[in-house]
Amino acid sequence: HPSLLPAFPGADAHSDVLSSQVRVSGCTVHVVDSGMDSGTILGQSRVPVFTGDSRASLAKRVQIEEHRLYPEIIDLICSGHEVVLDD
C-alpha cells in the first residue's frame, strides 16, 4: 500500500498525503483482510515528502521503495522469519 498505514488507507493515498501536508510518507506491505487496508502490517519503508511534490513525483519515490520492500518481505517469509510488525 502506498502509505504508512494505518495513515491514509484507501485508493488515493498520495493525494491524501499531499493534502495533509505531512513531511513523511512511504509504503506498507500488509496482509489483506476484509477491512480497508487494515490487515496485519508485515513491513514499512519511509520516504520524504518535499515541498512542491506532485502526486506523480511522490508516487515515483514511493514506488521505488515498494519495489525494494516487497521482495525483501517475501524473502523473509520464504526463509521462515517472523515478519509481523503488529497484531
Locations of the language-model features?
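Donor/substrate-binding cores of folate-linked one-carbon enzymes
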Residues: P2-L85
